[in-house]
């Protein structure tokens, strides 16, 4: 079982923990870490998105943040971000290759695989500054079925129009990234 810190509205651990399953059953506030892999081509920003495996408990088969995961109880955001980047994409990075970009909150209720899912997260956002060859990444097959580069503006425009047919990227997370890149 994976345990998470229950956090207050500012994302600070309260000293209590909850199982990941219970956090999503009851919508209990917990922490996650997201990492954006960003490139530039012909003067335009592009982002590497992962396609979530069909077995994922939420948003199966959709394109999502480059790398993301829950922060285990007792852990801190930066080491968790580095761990997820390594586990999901096979990118082994040192802490100096991740820039802290900001935080955001997300809360929603949906049904996946016929089961209610209540998410309530305080997310720390990082940007990976190292080189990436998408073709040589070692993907965690249980979580990620593929990765693909997308034009950042294309993803942003689609999400702003409310079109969620391809992307489950949190709009607030993309907004933090855009602010970091000076696009706001």
Descriptions of predicted regions:
Residues 9, 52, 152:
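Residues immediately flanking
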Residues 34-38, 48-49, 125-127:
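Short, hydrophobic/aromatic-rich beta-strand segments within well-structured domains
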Residues 1-43:
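Acidic, metal-coordinating catalytic segment for phosphate/diphosphate chemistry
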Residues 19-32, 43-91:
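Conserved Nudix-box catalytic region and its N-terminal flanking loop in Nudix hydrolases
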Residues 75-113:
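Internal catalytic-core helix/loop-beta-alpha segment
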Residues 21, 61-63, 67, 100-184:
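Nudix hydrolase/Nudix homology domain
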Residues 16, 50, 101-103:
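Residue-level detector of high-confidence beta-strand sites
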């Amino acid at each position: 079982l994976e345990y998470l810190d229950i956090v207050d509205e500012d994302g600070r651990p309260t000293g209590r923990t909850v199982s990941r399953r219970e956090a999503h059953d009851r919508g209990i506030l917990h922490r996650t870490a997201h990492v954006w892999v960003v490139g530039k081509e012909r003067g335009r920003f592009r982002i590497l998105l992962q396609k979530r495996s069909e077995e994922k408990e939420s948003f199966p088969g959709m394109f999502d943040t480059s790398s993301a995961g829950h922060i285990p109880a007792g852990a801190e955001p930066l080491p968790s971000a580095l761990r997820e980047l390594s586990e999901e994409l096979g990118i082994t990075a040192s802490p100096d290759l991740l820039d802290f970009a900001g935080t955001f909150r997300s809360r929603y209720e949906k049904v996946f695989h016929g089961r209610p899912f209540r998410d309530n997260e305080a997310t720390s956002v990082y940007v990976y500054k190292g080189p990436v060859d998408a073709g040589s990444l070692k993907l965690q097959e249980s979580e990620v079925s593929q990765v693909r580069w997308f034009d950042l503006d294309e993803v942003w425009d689609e999400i702003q129009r409310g079109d969620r047919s391809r992307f489950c990227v949190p709009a607030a997370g993309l907004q933090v990234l855009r602010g970091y890149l000076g696009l706001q």
